[in-house]
Amino acid sequence: NQALARLADGPVWSPAYITISDFFRQHSELTIADPIKSICDLYKSYVEVTGNTNETLDHFYGWGQLLLADFDDIDKNMADAESGEQKAELRRFFANFDDNPEGLRERFITLWAKLNDIYNDFRQRLRGQKLAYEGMLYRDVVENAKIEVQYEHYIFVGFNVLQKVEQLLFKRFLKEEKASFYWDYDRYYMKSTNEAG
């Protein structure tokens, strides 16, 4: 605001500022769920899909955090939870490990085989409560919501690496000519003769 005031010849209205996360949240009927509640709901989906009632919530919690982070990445990158590419990557990862006494590798592969069903059940469970994790909410806005804009024009500032869901949002605004973009990057590395790193 101070820089804007220095450039102005007289009084000016200060622009509204909002984070990209808050922008997505404003345009969704869903609310971001508490992380602990999310893990508890994910556990319910896990038990429902796998039928495994022997695994306690306490034991599942660590797995649940990883699984929730994976689901968040899947949605922010507009990926498919049942991607064969992801399953092949998992096999390559575990090929480097000997099986441990607790059968960690087998348990994880069993879980991975049901990943898509757990993902879908979990999303449906959250949606029924009008809740979401961040990636789910972002994806919901981009895929389903007609974005009712509050302002005639938006200025997106300071981005350099975008997730797929953000790219799709920005493309929509660009297509509708409702936004300008100011990127955060070093011009030196943007020249074809220079190499980053």
Task: Tell me the role of every PLM-derived stretch.
Residues 152, 166-197:
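Conserved RecA-like helicase ATPase core segment
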Residues 38, 158, 196-197:
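Generic detector of short, well-ordered, non-transmembrane alpha-helical segments enriched
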